[in-house]
Design a protein with these regions (language model features):
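Active-site residues of response regulator receiver
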Residues: 60
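Non-catalytic signal-transmission and effector/linker regions of two-component phosphorelay proteins
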Residues: 1-11, 24, 48, 53, ...
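Acidic catalytic/metal-coordinating carboxylates
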Residues: 38-42, 66-71
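A Lys-centered signature of the CheY-like receiver
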Residues: 108
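Charged docking surfaces used in two-component/phosphorelay signaling
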Residues: 21-29
Length: 129
């Protein structure tokens, strides 16, 4: 995660503007830096010009243009240390985990508490040996 005193930066990607806004507000209230994109293609573009480290990719799975799984693959190639947290109202966790065993899926709709717990889980898993 970001160093002590520097908040983690999260790239938030969702094609639903309402979900993006809700999620952004919660993350900012928790002290995170948030950059956002409305789809995977835009996220790749944003990440390519963002000079600072991005600690977490928080992405919807089902999106037009570039879906969340392809986005994560691209981001991991460009930024190997990035953590990924998937969100979906459609994808079964078992299907995602079968293909990507290390993945964490946040099922939509979610509460602020569930969102923060999932984000903390991702960062906690980073700190495990």
């Amino acid at each position: 995660m970001a160093s002590v005193g520097n908040p983690a930066t999260i790239l938030l990607v969702d094609d639903d503007e309402a979900v993006r806004g809700f999620t952004r507000r919660i993350l900012i209230q928790q002290g995170f830096n948030v950059i956002e994109a409305s789809d995977g293609a835009e996220a790749l573009e944003v990440a390519s010009v963002y000079a600072q480290p991005i600690d977490l990719l928080l992405t919807d799975v089902i999106m037009p243009k570039v879906n969340g799984l392809l986005l994560a693959q691209g981001m991991l190639q460009e930024r190997p240390g990035i953590r990924v947290l998937y969100m979906s109202g459609y994808v079964e966790k078992s299907l995602l985990v079968a293909k990507y065993p290390e993945s964490i899926l946040l099922q939509k709709p979610f509460t602020p508490q569930t969102l923060i717990a999932a984000v903390r889980q991702v960062f906690a898993s980073e700190e495990q040996p």
